[in-house]
Amino acid sequence: MATRRTFIKQLSAVAGVGLAASLGISLHGHAKAALNPVWRLPDEGEPQQRAFLAFGAQRAIWGGFTADVQAAQGRIARAIAEFQPLTVFCRAHERQLAEAICGSHNVSYVVTELDDIWVRDIGANFVVNDAGALGAVDFNFNGWGNKQRHAKDARLAAFAAKKYGVAQPRRSALVGEGGGIEVDGHGTGIMTESCWVNANRNPGWSRERVERELKAMLGLRKIIWLPGIKGRDITDAHVDFYARFVRPGVVVANLDTDPASYDHAVTQAHLAILKTATDADGRTLQVHTLSPPLAPRDSRFSRRNPDFAAGYINYFVINGAVIAPEFGDPQADKAAFTLLSALYPQRKVVQLEIDAIAGGGIHCVTSQLPVHGKPE
């Protein structure tokens, strides 16, 4: 079964060339890559102008689950559109299909080429500054370390940036993905070393060098590093499956309570770090935990599939709502709903069945354009 946490063998065939050469870029120095310090990546909970979704599932990757993946994306799209505008990127020949599945209320469609559905990883990282200007950062998507063909997806960040008003998006010297970035919008980030300090993306880079570049690109003053784990999923343990900022000083973390899961030890280690960490302003973090369901519903997506990754951390915060998953485990689903409702009291928690994409999740298949413009 092809899920996000599976190494997709039939399409992982980019090899034999240097990383920079394969991307068609030069890995220029930190000074050239750095954004002006006033630029920052907003917290997801700040007002959004619109959300994004990439309707890019194809049978070469998803096989017999393609229609199910599209249907799951449709549920996500329609839920978002109840609260704010949504743009769906889609292929020209699937434009009508995308609208039939994702709807027309509050949804616009932009035709472009795509390899897959993971818009969080392949899209532009939109930044803002104190003057109200909009910028964007492109982290040179390389298929999570050349594990999947990605030539079309690699072009989406620059395409989306220009489409929404950023004539010259900044291209980082780093290779990485949006799902590997978590920020509070006030100078603190959480990242996993397994994703960023990895030779399949950034060969020869030390953690210190990676940190300097991320700080410069995203307007960060401090990064809290979690170890993650390399090689167990296609992303090398993106942070958006492990820890999320609710607001500055408050974090919700994934805590796997199943001793048989490799994530049991990983999440315990992460929790220990987060409980003693301080943010850029010196505050000790208030840490809440959400545990994956121990009894998710039996389905053809989860059956005999050790890579099925059911977790509640991968939710998407939008204007007025939190779009979150449910997995058919009444106790765990209710616990997730209750905690998220308490953490986001001004937002409605909307839980959706997304089993077909639960090797990734709702956060992985969405991204956002922040509200920008100089305040009155």
Regions found by a protein language model. Name each.
Residues 6-28:
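N-terminal export signals
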Residues 32-376:
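The feature marks the mature, well-folded catalytic cores of soluble enzymes
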